[in-house]
Swiss-Prot record:
One of its GO terms (biological process) is glycine decarboxylation via glycine cleavage system. Gene3D superfamilies: Aspartate Aminotransferase, domain 1, Type I PLP-dependent aspartate aminotransferase-like (Major domain). PANTHER family: GLYCINE DEHYDROGENASE (DECARBOXYLATING), GLYCINE DEHYDROGENASE, DECARBOXYLATING. It is an enzyme of class 1 (oxidoreductase). This is Glycine dehydrogenase (decarboxylating). Its EC number is 1.4.4.2. HAMAP family: GcvP. SUPFAM superfamilies: PLP-dependent transferases (SSF53383). The keyword Flavoprotein does not apply. InterPro entries: GcvP, GDC-P_C, GDC-P_N, GDC_P, PyrdxlP-dep_Trfase, PyrdxlP-dep_Trfase_major, PyrdxlP-dep_Trfase_small. It comes from Yersinia pestis.
Length: 959
């Protein structure tokens, strides 16, 4: 035995599981790029003046089992009381078939946003089902594929109302006084930057006001009152005021659709359809509007189109509305949505079907009626006479009732003056009702549930007759076909097989960091201790969450060089918004509200200008030089011209051109010299961790894409997390929360998300990653990511020019391949190459960003040299195919590239092409052993946008 115990223990380290290439493979790649070691390579690439003098103090790595045991101990400090708090969050019963086959399945959670529809037809179908579900329940024409949460959706509805309003001089937005407090909180934050006046009052008071462009109502008020707003909606329509209604997705199963009553926009949380509370998230919001507002609608929309063979195919529709194209003119800065959670909700509806949903909603309402009847029989007073699932019970000694509730292991809503709130849910049992009777009336209450049931079933008037739904819902066959577990399992597997995720192949998308989402990182998110807590439960019941979030925050502080971290933003784009708000509020606190100009390099992510616009700033673009670096002369000139109106600069590092700019510290100094702040976009943190930090570079604030650098999976387009790190002077200006005091934060600022810690239940993923990697592992991950990118660039540069490199001819963690010379010479485009890669079993790199006519490749540290070589071989084989087109061997209009991707149906059909079937589908030998088969040919984008159809198609189209 030549190894000692320490060496044997090290061999069990997670680091070697996460990093795809062995030490021997790394040496081979280093030799190929001309570097002797990883540290030497980093010294050559990263500017010396920004390299950290030592590793960040995040501790040593733990093994998978050690980290899981440690986190389990922390989670055990959480106390899972029975939650009747409501306020938009309810306990659920996630069908095990969905839990196991979707939420715990890497074929679903490791996929990327479906920008490449040919490899995304499965999740696109599930999202189309979500849109159909939303349209049916809301009674409106068009639905989005999800938004970040209900409160964000409310803010987006206000923005839509202003964009679409014909009352151009109106600047007031009215909010009914019984919307959820967290919803109002986020609306007020958004209105602050837009300069809107928000009026909060009883709903009927809106008719007494002038200058109103939009109204927000809540169908089932936050304290439970069920409203019939049909008359009010009709009157507001006459006045050309755009109306939005917040709705409960479960209540909509039984209630009249707000769209049928005249609402223009309807939104809410889909959490109750199978998604655990998770201490606040992640949850998908649904959002629907009338067809006339489709161009103003926020978020992604799935549309039905056709492929090159004329067959039905799905795609993201109207993408020209999105922030990466319209930039500061975009409808919204939303980039990440909540695809995984929307798909759970849609499959919950598919599995239960309309009858099952009506049974669940009906049971919840019946239980509420029984509870109400029993409490009233015992002499208690209810504040409202119409309800769905929530009762406001007036009590004389509120403190005593709440103390007794805690002794029963029960959480009630506590913030209602002179009363408590009780919201029932699908987990509520007969025994729970008996316990509630005992809580309010006493152990000897003498109330019989069956007798109460008989009475209320005959005489219930808790739902007004005018509010009872009479139209059928979910009539499409997809909601009426898969109700046995066997059928449901097979349906989900059919959808999964249509998609390409990380469990099949590398996803080399530039600026997306599609790294391993390890099983050990994912396991804790379904633990009840994390999954079943209400975000507004008493803080002492969430001690485990507080410890875990506190540790993760401290690690992120150490890894970013900042002084504080705010966990609230639910996505990178929302983090940008929150960071810019902090800058804006900081300037205002210094009586410098005039500082409104945001400088943004021309290479920036499209979210940057969209977020700046949302934060009430004016965008001024800074030029880049021929090497892709920020033009310092132009920057200084524009900063000086902005003068005391300069608010900040938004810069990405390494740049979106895939290089470490040598002058990044000078960029920061110039902006600071003129009184501005530096926002460093954290999209490319995977090339910084352990090597440098934004704080060390000189930045003031950054968001961190936990779904990139810190291993939260992309989920097919969400969830994501975008916490912000800030220097001390900005810490008082990060988002706060109106319901929950955030420990360690002195901020009194408005919220940007519904929950105080955003999507808290996925934070254990990043906690596990950092704990298992340790300081050395995190640095090594960054180093290997940089090595992998340089290896690809070195091997491909003679076939495809690398557009931007540093002074030493090297790239950072990603490289941009310039396809423009090939396109000019041969007619073959970056699109053709991207689609041909599908035949080789790869997802395409990022197309035409940040430069049109290019492919941006980011191989993460999780990919092995074997997989990198497979990708390189595919790209070289494609280059050889392009050469055959150039030489006239294949015509431009009929070759493997322009016809890609090739399907099984095409393979067995009539073959008239000048190349073989084998070359079409098995272009290199390695494809044969793990062939991915696309189910559709190339999408017809023009047809899809000219023929917008965003509902479920006939089932025969899927067969």
């Amino acid at each position: 035995m030549t190894q000692n115990l320490s060496q044997l223990e090290h061999n069990d380290a997670f680091i070697q599981r996460h990093i795809g290439s062995s030490v021997e493979q790394q040496q081979q790649m280093l030799a190929a790029v001309g570097a002797s070691s990883l540290s030497t390579l980093i010294q050559q690439i990263v500017p010396a003046d920004i390299q950290l003098p030592g590793p960040p103090p995040v501790g040593e790595a733990a093994t998978e089992h050690q980290a899981l045991a440690e986190l389990k101990g922390i989670a055990s400090q959480n106390q899972c009381y029975k939650s009747y708090i409501g306020m938009g969050y309810s306990p659920v019963l996630t069908p095990p078939v969905i839990l196991r086959n979707m939420l715990e399945n890497p074929g679903w959670y490791t996929a990327y946003t479906p920008y490449q529809p040919e490899v995304s037809q499965g999740r696109l179908e599930a999202l189309l089902n979500f849109q159909q579900l939303t349209q049916d329940l809301t009674g409106l024409d068009l639905a989005s594929a999800s938004l970040l949460d209900e409160a964000t959706a409310a803010a987006e509805s206000m923005a839509l109302a202003k964009r679409a309003s014909k009352l151009k001089d109106a600047n007031r937005f009215f909010v009914a006084d019984d919307v959820h407090p967290q919803t109002l909180d986020v609306v007020l934050t958004r209105a602050e930057t837009f300069g809107f006046d928000v009026i909060v009052d009883r709903a009927e008071k809106v008719l007494e006001l002038d200058g109103i462009f939009g109204v927000l109502l809540q169908q089932v008020g936050t304290t439970g009152e069920l409203h019939d707003y049909s008359a009010l909606l009709a009157e507001l329509k006459k006045r050309k005021i755009i109306t939005s209604v917040a709705a409960d997705i479960m209540a909509l199963v039984l209630l009249t659709a707000p769209g049928a009553q005249g609402a223009d926009v309807v939104f809410g949380s889909a959490q109750r359809f199978g998604v655990p509370m998770g201490y606040g998230g992640p949850h998908a919001a649904f959002f629907a509007c009338r067809d006339e507002f489709k161009r103003s609608m926020p978020g992604r929309i799935i549309g039905v189109s056709r492929d090159a063979a004329g067959n039905t195919a799905l795609r993201m529709a109207m993408q020209t509305r999105e922030q990466h194209i319209r930039r500061e003119k975009a409808n919204s800065n939303i980039c990440t949505s909540q695809v995984l959670l929307a798909n759970i909700a849609s499959l919950y509806a598919v599995y239960h079907g309309p009858q099952g949903l009506q049974r669940i909603a009906g049971r919840i309402h019946r239980m509420t009626d029984i509870l109400a009847a029993g409490l009233q029989h015992a002499g208690l007073t209810l504040r409202f006479k119409h309800w769905f699932d929530t009762l406001t019970v007036e009590v004389k000694d509120k403190a005593a009732v709440l103390a007794r509730a805690l002794s029963f292991g029960i959480n009630l809503r506590t913030d209602i003056h002179g009363a408590v709130g009780i919201t029932l849910n699908e987990t509520t049992s007969r025994e729970d009702i008996q316990t509630l009777f005992a809580l309010f009336v006493g152990d000897n209450h003498g109330l019989d549930i069956d007798q109460l049931d008989a009475a209320v079933s005959q005489h219930s008037q808790s739902i007004q007759d005018s509010m009872l739904r009479r139209d059928p819902i979910l009539t499409h066959p997809v909601f009426n076909r898969y109700h046995s577990e066997t059928e449901m399992m097979r349906y989900m597997h059919r959808l999964e097989r249509k998609d390409l995720a990380l469990n099949q192949a590398m996803i080399p998308l530039g600026s997306c960091t599609m790294k391993l989402n390890a099983a050990a990182e994912m396991i804790p998110i379904t633990w009840p201790e994390f999954a079943e807590l209400h975000p507004f439960c008493p803080p002492e019941q969430a001690a485990g969450y507080q410890q875990m979030i506190g540790q993760l925050s401290q690690w992120l502080v150490q890894l970013t060089g900042y002084d504080a971290v705010c966990m609230q933003p639910n996505s990178g784009a929302q983090g940008e918004y929150a960071g810019l708000l902090a800058i804006r509020r900081y300037h205002e606190s210094r009586n410098q509200a005039n500082r409104h100009i945001c400088l943004i390099p021309s290479s920036a992510h499209g979210t940057n200008p969209a977020s700046a616009q949302m934060a009430g700033m004016s965008v001024v673009v800074v030029a880049c030089d021929k090497q892709g670096n920020i033009d310092l002369h132009d920057l200084r000139q524009k900063a000086e011209h902005a003068g005391d109106e300069l608010s900040c600069i938004m810069v990405t590092y390494p740049s979106t051109h895939g290089v470490y700019e040598e002058t990044i510290r000078e960029v920061c100094q110039i902006v600071h010299q003129f009184g501005g702040q530096v926002y460093l976009d954290g999209a490319n943190m995977n090339a910084q961790v352990g090597i440098t930090t934004p704080g060390y570079i000189g930045a003031d604030v950054s968001h961190l894409n936990l779904h990139k650098t810190f291993c939260i999976p992309h989920g097919g387009g969400g969830p994501g997390m975008g916490p912000i790190g800030v220097k001390a002077h900005l810490a008082p200006f990060v988002p706060g929360h109106s319901v929950v005091q955030i420990d360690g934060m002195t901020t009194q600022q408005g919220a940007v998300s519904a929950a105080p810690f955003g999507s808290a239940s996925i934070l254990p993923i990043s906690w596990m990653y950092i704990r298992m990697m340790g300081a050395d592992g995190l640095k090594q991950a960054s180093q290997v990511a940089i090595l992998n990118a340089n290896y690809i660039a070195t091997r491909l540069k003679n076939a495809y020019p690398v557009l931007y490199t540093g002074h030493d001819g090297r790239v950072a963690h990603e490289c941009i391949l310039d396809i423009r010379p090939l396109k000019e010479a041969t007619g073959i485009s970056e699109m053709d190459i991207a689609k041909r890669l599908i035949d080789f079993g790869f997802h395409a790199p990022t197309m035409s960003f940040p430069v049109a006519g290019t492919l941006m490749v980011e191989p993460t540290e999780s990919e092995s040299k074997v997989e990198l070589d497979r990708f390189i071989d595919a790209m070289l084989a494609i280059r050889a195919e392009i050469e055959k087109v150039a030489q006239g061997e294949w015509p431009l209009e009929d070759n493997p590239l322009v016809n890609a991707p090739h399907t099984q149906a095409e393979l067995v059909g009539e073959w008239t092409h000048p190349y073989s079937r084998e070359l079409a589908v098995f272009p290199v030998a390695g494809v044969l052993e793990n062939k991915y088969w696309p189910t559709v040919k190339r999408l017809d984008d023009v047809y899809g946008d000219r023929n917008l159809f965003c509902s479920c198609v006939p089932i025969s189209d899927y067969e």
